[in-house]
Amino acid sequence: MADVTRDAGLKQAAPARTEKPAADFGYVGIDAILEQMRRKAMKQGFEFNIMVVGQSGLGKSTLINTLFKSKISRKSVQPSSEERIPKTIEIKSITHDIEEKGVRMKLTVIDTPGFGDHINNENCWQPIMKFINDQYEKYLQEELNINRKKRIPDSRIHCCIYFIPATGHSLRPLDIEFMRRLSKVVNIVPVIAKADTLTLEERDYFKQRITADLLANGIDVYPQKQFDEDSEDRLINEKFREMIPFAVVGSDQEYQINGRRILGRKTKWGTIEVENTTHCEFAYLRDLLIRTHMQNIKDITSSIHFEAYRVKRLNEGQNMLSNGVADKEELAANEM
């Protein structure tokens, strides 16, 4: 009996075994997941869907071609008479495959001819809102499909560039109404179109007025403050937020300046270099949309805008189901 007690005491007194951290056994190779992800992404390619909205003649097609350095978006034809302006807003899209350094991207540009071109532009945002929601619905139905595809084609609008005419005054009621409504369902990036028509002083004043209008009307454009993930994100995004709206100039014409090939526009005052940040803010817009935030734009579309639509639609379906059950129970009670 004493031996049993002694053995039990020894067992209790035995020190707990300490596991060595995995790092002590040498290299594991967890970081290799990054290379695996890179190879998979390069093999599959990815999609980016960008919508451009603004009245005719603001250089929407030219800016898109300049952003991606490709003849992607067809130049819209300037109507010569009132009859040639579409009676309703048309939604047109064109898809272009781009490859750079082994990375493949399927770019879809959605244009909205007819927006803001009429005397009465009341509710002209509705067809655009419907189109955006239709893409969410299409994606949702694919997700709910029992035999859904391994990779669902993504036609959701990731970003909407909204073109503001360079009036030098303030936002029009049309601008405010459109951005106020659409910013709830899509990432809005406002730009001042053809900013070279303004002096630097006029441009700065116009940007200040627009910023004040956005704030006064509760319009939350991309990158939204509430989606900053950490202090590093906040620091980077704050710099972009201070530039919004981007004052841009687009051009797909190349010129030689002091032995350098540049994209630019020639005026009677000289050549405007599109990618020169002292001339315009095109380079900052390109950085935001392509070089630093493209994946984040897609993530916000999926986790915020599409998720809000998905929850709304599923709640609607649940309510319809509940109402249907209640109706059947009421009918059965009446029959009794």
What is the predicted function of each stretch?
Residues 1-135, 276, 286-290, 332-335:
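Conserved G1/Walker A P-loop phosphate-binding module
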Residues 3-15, 156, 173-174, 184-336:
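Conserved GTP-binding G-domain of TRAFAC-class P-loop NTPases and closely related GTPase folds
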Residues 23-25, 41-48, 53, 58-59, ...:
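Eukaryote-biased feature marking scaffold/signaling PDZ-domain proteins and nuclear chromatin regulators
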Residues 24, 115-121, 129-173, 189-190, ...:
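Conserved Switch II/interswitch segment of TRAFAC-class P-loop GTPases
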Residues 37-39, 149, 234-235:
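Generic recognition of flexible, low-complexity loop/linker segments
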Residues 51-58, 69, 101-103, 112-117, ...:
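Conserved beta-strand elements of beta-rich interaction domains across eukaryotes
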Residues 63-69, 75-80, 120-125, 143-144, ...:
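Short coil/turn segments at secondary-structure boundaries
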Residues 122, 127-136, 140, 214-227:
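Internal, charge-rich low-complexity segments
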